[in-house]
Amino acid sequence: MKFILNFYILIFILSCTKDENPQQIQTQGYNMLLIGNSFFRPYADHLDNLTTEANLFEHNSTVVFRGGENGRPINLWNDSITEEHQLIKSTLDQGNIEVFGMTSGYDIDSDNPTEGQSAWINYALQNNPNIIIFIAIPTFDFPNGDSNGTRPDWDTFASDNGFNSIQEFYDYYVNEMVHKEIVDELRLEFPSTKIFTIPTGWATKNLAQMNLDNELSDDISMVGPKSSSIFTDEKGHQGQIVIETGTMIWLNSIYNVDLSLFNYDTGFTTDLHAIAQDIIDSHDSNYKF
């Protein structure tokens, strides 16, 4: 009887100790290769900072950047004499890349939207047979329209394509175009390779709408300085509030970091952790890591 009593006392003490002094699980980082343009690079660069904050040891990334269409997988592949193309190949040739990330961009005039991604995955597998692939899905550009071109503002762009809102149009882009026309096809071509997506662009879409609806706790402009705006220019490049949110989406998508427990100061009063988590929760689980 005394033994049983002491046993339950011990269990009680251990359970209390666990609650009062939770042990942090330390996770090994990945060796990553990340290739893309200016709607990809800010998150790739900032991920290094957040992995440090999350105590992810030995996270390492090689980031290869080219602006605009030049940063799409197909252009990075076809422009074979460029320094960027050679850097991607030489990095993959080392045979130690665990995660390879790229954009969903492709030539809309091509009959094969997976051509660029497929070429790079084929090359990567030669020396990295267990490599994991992710495709980061960017936002649409030119939120207020292109003053030097024919692209209208987002609302008109959505309406012209038969959608009631830019959110509805973007949801179609993510789920019907990127997932079905790119990812599903790549999975058929590479059945033994893990391929998932990161819904980065929702950070821009949701924060922009929240700002229009006066739902942000910070004084944020739609267009202006990087530190205090959703967009920094007409093209729609990201302000810091978008970068912080989008990079936390990356952190969770790649490393499964619980954002509700992630003690990181974004520099904003708005609960960007919750916004990022909502986006992650809404992402189709069939396309998660």
What name fits each language-model region?
Residues 1-10:
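Sec-dependent signal peptide recognition
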Residues 14-29:
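Bacterial Sec-dependent N-terminal signal peptides
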Residues 26, 38-42, 110-115, 173-174, ...:
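Soluble non-cytosolic domains of exported or imported proteins
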Residues 30-35, 39-123, 129, 282:
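Conserved SGNH/GDSL esterase-like catalytic core that processes O-acyl groups on lipids
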Residues 46, 123, 178, 182-185, ...:
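Amphipathic alpha-helical segments that form well-ordered structural scaffolds
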Residues 89-240:
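Alpha-helical cap/lid subdomain in secreted, periplasmic
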Residues 213-289:
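Conserved catalytic region of serine esterases and O-acyltransferases that act on ester linkages
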